[in-house]
Design a protein with these regions (language model features):
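Solvent-exposed loop/turn segments at secondary-structure junctions
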Residues: 27-30, 62-64, 121, 128-131
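A structural signal for well-ordered alpha-helical segments within the folded catalytic domains
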Residues: 18-19, 39-43, 67, 105-112
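A residue-level signal for conserved active-site and pocket-lining positions in enzyme catalytic cores
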Residues: 26, 72, 114
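His/Asp/Glu-rich, glycine-adjacent segments
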Residues: 77-154
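Glycine-/proline-rich flexible loop or hinge segments
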Residues: 27-30, 50-56, 65-68, 87-99
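Short, structured active-site-proximal loop/turn typified by the sulfatase FGly-forming signature C/S-X-P-X-R
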Residues: 34-78, 122
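Active-site-proximal N-terminal segment of extracellular/periplasmic enzymes that hydrolyze or transfer
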Residues: 2-53
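Extracellular/periplasmic catalytic domains that process cell-envelope and extracellular macromolecules
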Residues: 13-16, 65, 115-116
Length: 154
């Protein structure tokens, strides 16, 4: 019997001896960070990178904030997790609907699965539109999970 968690057909260690920090810089390029580092503009990020991992992922297509971030936290493409854009058009009403509601998600996030296995989860996002998607499946009543955005941190 494995002590790993299976999340969307991928295995992850079920317990960590170290803290995991995931930083998604949507719309950035690694060259921007390299130049900032050379100019000593990112000392804290440089320390995190030096003491851990620095992994580059390819963007999901379509290359928009919501599908890219959800692909990162589910390990799946939009066709599997369900978030195919930032908005979709509803012909019946003629309106654009923002895809920031978890009801559109068809795959759990790594955060949800680790939370359900007993882990504590802290999520911080710059954009509030991602908060409900990233925090999907977490309960904020038992002090094991927190999720907020810098955009609406008050």
């Amino acid at each position: 019997m494995s002590n790993n968690l299976e999340i969307n057909n991928r295995e992850y260690p079920s317990s960590f001896s170290k803290t995991a920090i995931v930083i998604c810089l949507d719309g950035s390029q690694k060259e921007y960070l390299e130049e900032a580092s050379k100019s000593n503009l990112t000392p804290n990020l440089d320390k995190l990178i030096a003491s851990g991992e620095n992994l580059l992922v390819h963007s999901a297509i379509p290359s928009f904030t919501n599908p890219n971030n959800i692909s990162i936290v589910t390990g799946q493409p939009s066709s599997v997790h369900g978030i195919c854009g930032n908005f979709f058009y509803t012909p019946e009403t003629g309106e654009e609907v923002m895809m920031n509601d978890p009801k559109y998600m068809r795959a759990p996030t790594i955060f949800e699965k680790f939370y359900n296995s007993g882990s504590k989860i802290a999520l911080v996002t710059a954009k509030d539109k991602l908060r409900t998607l990233l925090g999907n499946g977490l309960s904020f009543d038992d002090e094991r999970a927190i999720c907020f955005s810098a955009e609406k941190s008050d």
